[in-house]
């Protein structure tokens, strides 16, 4: 841990409800009537971002986003069981909507101008905070403290975009999944 590695964390998000292709056209998302006719709503969630979306020791998906998704299913279709969860990674959220693999994303997705050009967002369901996690013996209290250190980020996140755009001299170590990023932080 003393190697100067830190990790970013982002808490927050909005519901993604439809997508647009690269030309800006709305993709063929299922309509509410089609979802009701099918009897299931397909929702994308994280599998490794406790407490939001994660797989427990019994192999069951859990978390706040999962709870919220079950409530959506109950309100729309009559039962919390009328939901099919699909695991997504940060970088795959838009693609899963565009390809109709899911109807909705509940996976801590911050609204940005770039993302808003590709998908439609509902109102946010939690507040967002960007932070840095660091070892006790190498505390990061200010972005200046990151100079000369490696910063772990998850691909496709607001943290990756923020540091790439605003601090290009900070070396980013990028991972696909939150668990991989966490393990890398622990491994130093």
Give the role of each language-model region.
Residues 26-106:
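Extracytoplasmic small-molecule ligand-binding "clamshell" domains
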Residues 70, 82-145:
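Acidic, polar ligand-binding/catalytic clefts
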């Amino acid at each position: 841990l003393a190697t100067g590695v830190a990790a970013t964390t982002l808490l927050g998000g909005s519901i993604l409800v439809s997508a647009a292709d690269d030309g800006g056209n709305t993709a063929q998302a299922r309509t509410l009537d089609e979802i009701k006719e099918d009897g299931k709503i397909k929702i994308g969630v994280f599998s490794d971002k406790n407490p939001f979306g994660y797989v427990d020791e019994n192999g069951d998906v859990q978390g706040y986003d999962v709870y919220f998704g079950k409530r959506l299913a109950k309100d729309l279709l009559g039962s919390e069981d009328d939901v099919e969860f699909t695991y997504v990674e940060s970088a795959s959220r838009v693609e899963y909507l565009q390809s109709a693999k899911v109807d909705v994303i509940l996976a801590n997705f911050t609204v940005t101008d770039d993302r808003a050009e590709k998908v439609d967002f509902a109102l946010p369901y939690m507040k967002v905070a960007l932070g840095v996690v660091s070892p006790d013996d190498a505390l990061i209290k200010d972005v200046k403290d990151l100079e000369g250190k490696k910063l772990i980020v998850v691909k496709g996140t607001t943290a990756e975009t923020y540091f790439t755009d605003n601090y290009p001299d900070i070396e980013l170590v990028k991972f696909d999944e939150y668990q991989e990023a966490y393990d890398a932080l622990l491994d130093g």
